[in-house]
């Protein structure tokens, strides 16, 4: 087995590393840099990747693609895609399959393709350094990436000519690099604020075992959003001073974006900076220049709410892991945005301790991916990585209830089966609808996909045994199967990347689950009450058909009256009324039970009398002497 490289496929920058002996090493690219801008440009029928693409962005904004990681695995109608359309100079278009693609140089590209071009650059960088062909890689993704986004990332690797041995979560990779060859046992938090995404993971590290206890995050929050705030501020100030709106000028926007990013970085180490952009635009009076003094205090005011948005996922991750802030022994900072003093201050305030700054936030994820690659090709031993799935997975059951098969923060790989049945008599097929989320009703969660299991032999409802199995592999990709135990018929499906979950939807699912917990509980209780009542109606009608003639007309009338009342109550949404009528029918059913018992007792008594009353026949016989 050859070398397995580790790639941090970032929103803003990417990085590649490999195990060299017993240590992971970041590999410099052809430009002599340890990280490569995640930017692709198409100019004069040529494709540029990384720094060369970034350098020409100002003069070629419409054909320069950046931050495509925000689009990967997303549907064109996703609110986050719509938001992104107003932030980038290139065109985001709707693909035939409904996904969000990009358009450049009169061609349409999927985000997986654009990502593949970046991965190819990483692959070439590694091959130039190692002097051998590289075909296998471990690629990192945000911990909160959903199934569609993970598959799309894996597809990007395949397009780039790489066999993706493992998709690994970025905070987990960072923890691997942080805890590699350290013997101490610790509970740590990894706070990862990168160019486009935010993740937080809580891990326990002990004797080479890296166990993720919980994870949370926001897949549409990162440095790009900070840059946009600065950019909008510059547009506003310039408009106030000159009366000219730069927001419709692609060339000016690209220059402003670069200036915003540069100012943001400078203000991490200084309290004030000058933003000078000569000849930013022109009008009838001549050329216009932008010259603005920008302070750290102004920046912090602009982005304060963005920083605050990272704290709630931290709080939720701790809650899910069963920890308090003072249980965390180390907070590891990952991602370029964690260099910002205000971010470090917010982390310190929440966790009550100084964050650990002993790792390079731009490189630590790639180093961790390389270590995982070393584990997979046996270069590294004595390391066990236990990661988790970020959201609950389940199916829709009778009444629209979301029945969980795998809870969020379950260790992966994981496999879970549960037996379900049919809702109607002689039902020959069932539709399995797979959802992801935290709400009690399926419709409030995200539909990942659906499939049919057909050919179920005719049987009364509740009799067929349909085993539904969820299987999440080590990459976090979901496989679902349904099998009729009687006929052996089986249907399997891998949830396909046909849109995936948006960051807003994922975040909203958890928040809605908390804010609407009471409402969800009541709704679930109503559904369960109705299901129980419906089953009682069904069994009562069946019993009446079989034993109704054993009841007196008065007893039968009482049961039928209670049955009619419960049916009427089932038409309402009143759980207490349904419970009351269910109780009445249950009591009335006692009469049927008594009649059945009486009939059975009489039959047994009759059989016993028949045996006792049988006549004994005396037989005459002769005793014949032996001769």
From Swiss-Prot:
GO MF term set: ATP binding; ATP-dependent protein folding chaperone; unfolded protein binding
Protein induction: By stress conditions e.g. heat shock.
Keywords: ATP-binding, Chaperone, Nucleotide-binding, Phosphoprotein, Stress response
Pfam families with a match to the protein in the record: HSP70
Positions of disulphide bridges: none
Modification Phosphothreonine occurs at: 197
Protein task: Acts as a chaperone.
Protein family per UniProt: Belongs to the heat shock protein 70 family.
Descriptive protein name: Chaperone protein DnaK
Organism: Rickettsia prowazekii (strain Madrid E)
Top-level taxonomy: Bacteria, Pseudomonadati, Pseudomonadota, Alphaproteobacteria, Rickettsiales
